[in-house]
Amino acid sequence: MSKGTPSMGKRNKGSYHIRCRRCGRRAYHVRKKRCAACGFPNKRMRKYSWQNKKVNGKRIK
């Protein structure tokens, strides 16, 4: 297989992410065995303050 742009078209044969058991989103990475959305199989849920927009529309820098 060659490097570069021609080999990028061969990447869409399978799927990297399947449905997560905990959150139900299609974000569980099969090879990494980790959900990109909720962090499963970690015990703590993955959540950050920057995921949600502020209610009053102002972002704090």
From Swiss-Prot:
Keyword Ribosomal protein applies: yes
Pfam families: Ribosomal_L37e
Residue sites binding Zn(2+) per the record: C20, C23, C35, C38
Keywords noted in UniProt: Metal-binding, Ribonucleoprotein, Ribosomal protein, RNA-binding, rRNA-binding, Zinc, Zinc-finger
GO MF annotations, alphabetized: RNA binding; rRNA binding; structural constituent of ribosome; zinc ion binding
Disulfide links within the chain: none
Annotated PROSITE patterns: RIBOSOMAL_L37E
GO biological process, any: translation
Source superkingdom: Archaea
Entry GO CC: cytosolic large ribosomal subunit
Family membership: Belongs to the eukaryotic ribosomal protein eL37 family.
Role, per record: Binds to the 23S rRNA.
Name the UniProt record assigns to this protein: Large ribosomal subunit protein eL37
Originating species: Methanocaldococcus jannaschii (strain ATCC 43067 / DSM 2661 / JAL-1 / JCM 10045 / NBRC 100440)
Lineage start: Archaea, Methanobacteriati, Methanobacteriota, Methanomada group, Methanococci
